Structures are given as structure tokens and as C-alpha cells.
Amino acid sequence: MFIGGLHMIHKKIGAFIFQDVQNPNETKTTAVTLRLYALILSVYFLVLFCVCCFLRDVPSSLLTLICGILYVFAFRITYLNHTHFASIFSQLLTLLWITVFIQRFGWDCGVQHFLFVLLVLNFAVSFHRIRTKIFVGICTCAYRLLLYSYTRYHLPVIQLSTDANICIQTIDTLFIFAELITVMIIFTQNSQQMEHKLIRYNLELEHIASTDPLTGLFNRWQMYKRLETCISRYTQHKLQTLTVAMGDIDF
């Protein structure tokens, strides 16, 4: 009974997250991608909030709490037919908190790697032309180099200990990979399913074209093709014996 209850809760949560959009000009895939992106980052900031509370860093605790709340807001607005706004809001928010965290904790905190997640998200949910996406990629690369240059000339506001750096880097790595895997699965799932359907449909068409609809046996064209293959293998001594039986069902 307990397992059945958990299964029911899991189905309800899945149905809520994968709920379709009402706006005909927006896609379900984009909305679901943004929801999962915001949801994972909400959990990420909840974990960081606990870490900052453990370190007794009140300003950082408030900062992580605010970021988490903002991503909950980004998650919510995907259900209000504002997917485009949610996309822009989530990406700008990500750029903002990465900048603040680099300034506050320094390069070693590892949050700059979320720029890779941001780039993948932009490619997944954006419908712009290839040139625009390439331009966004170049700007993201330049911004990362700018952040690195900033940290070479400016000390962070808070000097984290080695243990704290390892802890935050570990958390960052886990959530970065979770974000990348999630976004890429959602982004590629539809295209892979469509390709699988096309392959299966082509195989069915090939089978129909090569068999007799009455008997289900090979038709004349497919039989000639099969015989040519067998004769070729026989002449190449890859087939020791070759037996051909011919019959006619029209009697």
C-alpha cells in the first residue's frame, strides 16, 4: 500500500511537471525543459542555503535563499503561458547570480561552469537562427574569460577554506551534470523518437514491398534479389551447396 501511494504521488508529480502549455504559439518541450532547469536550480540553492547556514554566513544564506525563490517563480510562470518570458528570465537570472557568486566567493567556487549549462539551455529552448546561436556562444565564452580576468585582479569578498571549496565544488559538479543530462534528454527525446518511428516505418514499407500480400512469401522481385545474393556467395565459395525449389500456387 505504501509503495502504491508513492507510485501515485510520482505519477502526479510527473503529470504536473510534464503538463502541456495552453498557448498554441508555445511548445511543451520548451516549457518542460525550463521547468526542470528551474526545479533543479531551486534544489541546488536549497542545498547551498544549508551549507551557508552551517558556515554561519548570513549574507550568503540570504543570497542563496533569494535565488532559490526566484527560480521557484521562474518555474511557476511556465504554467501561465509565459514560456518566452520564463526563458529570458531564467537565463538572465543565471548570468546575474554567477557574476555575484564569482565576485563574492572567487573563481575556485566553480559556479562559472554553469555557463556551459546556460549555453546548452539557450540552444535547446531558443528558436533563433544558427548565426544568432553562434553569436550567443561566442558571447558566453567571452563572458567566462572576462570573469576569469576579473578574479585575477580582484580578491573575493569571502575567502573560503579548502574544505568549503571542496564541498561547494562537489555540489556544483553534481548539479551541473544533473542539469546537462536533463536538458539534453528532454531536447533530444522527441527527435530520437521520431527517427525511431521513421526507421520502423521504412522497415515496414520495405517488408510490404518485398512480400506477396496473399501468401506473405517473398515476391518475384525479392526472390530474384535473394537468388542473386546466393549465387554470388556460391561463386565466391562462401556457400557450398545451393538448392532451388520452384513451385506455383496458381492451379
Q: At which residue positions do the language-model features occur?
A:
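Short, Lys/Arg-rich, polar N-terminal cytosolic tail immediately upstream
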Residues: 2-26
